[in-house]
Regions:
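An alpha-helical repeat/solenoid feature that recognizes helix-turn-helix modules
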Residues: 16-42, 62-87, 104-140, 152-192, ...
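Fold-core signature of tandem repeat domains
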Residues: 158, 208, 329, 338-340, ...
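Core helices of alpha-solenoid repeat scaffolds
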Residues: 49, 91-95, 140, 144, ...
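Surface-exposed, proline-enriched loop/turn segments that connect beta strands in immunoglobulin-like
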Residues: 211, 321-324, 357
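Serine/threonine-rich, repeat-prone extracellular segments and beta-strand-based repeat modules
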Residues: 342-374
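Terminal, non-catalytic domain-edge segments
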Residues: 1-8, 249, 262-311
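Solvent-exposed, low-complexity, repeat-rich "mucin-like" stalks and linkers
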Residues: 310-345
Length: 374
């Protein structure tokens, strides 16, 4: 049954990825699958969280890629899934770059699709652009409109390029739009057109493929889209051909012992990690639908699955400012006000750091303030 395949694939991912890191394989999608499945392993999630903090601090910016904001969106999805706060990752707010709609859409339709998904995972407020910015402020309406405007003429659906609906991009767009399906007639009509366009491409074996090859990832994204729309990927007649459902088609790529193949090569299947992660979170999405839970990306039910490290916070890269005013040394200790910032986050004395003054009594000395991370 799909449940057994799901259980063993969760274990396969956990055993294969000993430590998840920021990345499109072995990273956020694996974390998403395990976290939304309800797999408990605080050490594993904590290692991932600490890796994200290190990664962001090494870049030294809240923009994880110079141009593509899908990196930010993907990490926001991973962090939210484990109950972490994407607005303070080692002192950086990963939501902030998504406030600039021009930057979000720079890479094409993928940008707004994943920005909308990421923002909705935690129902996050979109940060405001600075007053002096000439860029377009991102809003949910703006993201939805951008996606709707990119719908293909004719039969509908979406694609990165060309005039034929692409299964992956179309079903990803549907996943982004799904929360607005019932409330917005324009969204509903576009989603219905897209889901029909993709159904028309489904092959006799129930399979789906971008670029003419049936592959498990295209099936996986379609299953996620159907689950988000509260439609059953195993019985929904629009997605059953010759008694083969889209779920059957994806499960045909399963490999005993856990794991999924990308596509059959010379009739043989071999485990592919990206395919395994996508198929597994698609099964999580399907299982959540079957058991009446919130959708894969509606994380209003999230729990904190990791533990914040008890190790001391390093403040060596923090900016320490001492209020500068003429102090006259008269034999009593002087303690000017001190501000400590990490990235763009103001740190709190007694929570993040302690301070100690030295040489601050007698004139002629160089007074010093020492900030120590807690």
């Amino acid at each position: 049954s799909y449940k057994e395949m799901l259980d063993s694939s969760i274990k396969y991912i956990r055993n294969t990825i000993t430590e998840a890191e920021v990345g499109s394989v072995g990273g956020e999608w694996a974390v998403l699958a395990l976290a939304r499945y309800g797999y408990e392993d605080p050490e594993w999630y904590t290692a991932y969280y600490n890796n994200v903090v290190k990664y962001v601090q090494n870049i030294g910016s809240n923009k994880l890629h110079s141009r593509k904001l899908t990196d930010n969106s993907r990490v926001i999805i991973g962090l939210t899934a484990i109950g972490a706060d994407p607005t303070n990752v080692g002192g950086y707010n990963l939501l902030e770059p998504l406030a600039n709609l021009d930057d979000v859409v720079w890479q094409g339709i993928n940008g707004p699709i994943y920005a909308l998904i990421a923002l909705d995972t935690g129902d996050y407020e979109i940060p405001e652009l600075p007053d002096d910015s000439t860029a377009t402020q991102t809003t949910r309406e703006g993201l939805i409109q951008y996606i709707l405007d990119k719908e293909l003429e004719g039969n509908g659906g979406w694609a990165l390029w060309g005039s034929k609906a692409d299964p992956d991009i179309t079903t990803m767009a549907v996943q982004a739009l799904a929360p607005y399906y019932n409330a917005n007639a324009e969204v509903k009509a576009a989603v219905d057109r897209g889901m029909k366009a993709i159904s028309d491409q489904q092959l006799a074996n129930g399979g789906m493929g971008s670029w003419g090859t049936v592959n498990s990832e295209s099936c996986a994204q379609t299953i996620c889209a159907l689950s988000d729309l509260e439609r059953d990927a195993d019985t929904d007649l629009q997605y059953v051909k010759n008694m083969n459902s889209i779920l059957d088609a994806m499960l045909s790529f399963y490999i005993d012992g856990g794991g999924f193949a990308h596509a059959a090569q010379n009739g043989k299947l071999s485990v592919n990690m990206m395919a395994t992660e996508q198929a597994t979170y698609a099964l999580v999405s399907y299982d959540r639908f079957k058991t009446g839970k919130t959708t894969l990306y509606n994380m209003s039910d999230r729990k904190k699955l990791y533990t914040e490290s008890a190790e001391k916070k390093s403040v060596e890269k923090a900016n320490v400012t001492v209020a500068d005013f003429g102090l006259v040394y008269d034999g009593t200790a002087k303690e000017p006000e001190v501000t400590v910032k990490y990235g763009d986050i103001l740190l709190t004395e007694g929570v993040d750091y302690t301070k100690k003054f030295s040489n601050n009594v007698e004139a002629g000395n160089t007074a010093k303030v020492t900030i120590t991370g807690m």
